[in-house]
């Protein structure tokens, strides 16, 4: 699967901080490491990652959270290394 640079950076960030399975973070926090003019592209990349089943969405009372899919971690590691 071919992903854009935003999606790869999001996967790297989530993997580095250990947001896998039960540990999740807000979608808004994923945007913080990107410039303000690119944050719309980050939201689009998150949607692509959810459709690809690489990120698991979690609805909370205080917004949308997400974590890496632990069943896809081997594929995620390969994508990050490229």
Range-by-range predicted roles:
Residues 20-33:
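Short acidic, hydrophobic short linear motifs in intrinsically disordered regions
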Residues 50-60:
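A short, conserved structural fragment
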Residues 5, 22-25, 41-44:
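Alpha-helix N-cap and coil->helix boundary residues
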Residues 1-20, 80-82:
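Short alpha-helical segments that sit at the start of domains
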Residues 71-82:
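Short, amphipathic alpha-helical interaction segments positioned at domain boundaries
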Residues 62-69:
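Minor-groove-contacting beta-hairpin "wing" of winged helix-turn-helix DNA-binding domains
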Residues 35-51:
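Short amphipathic alpha-helical interaction segments
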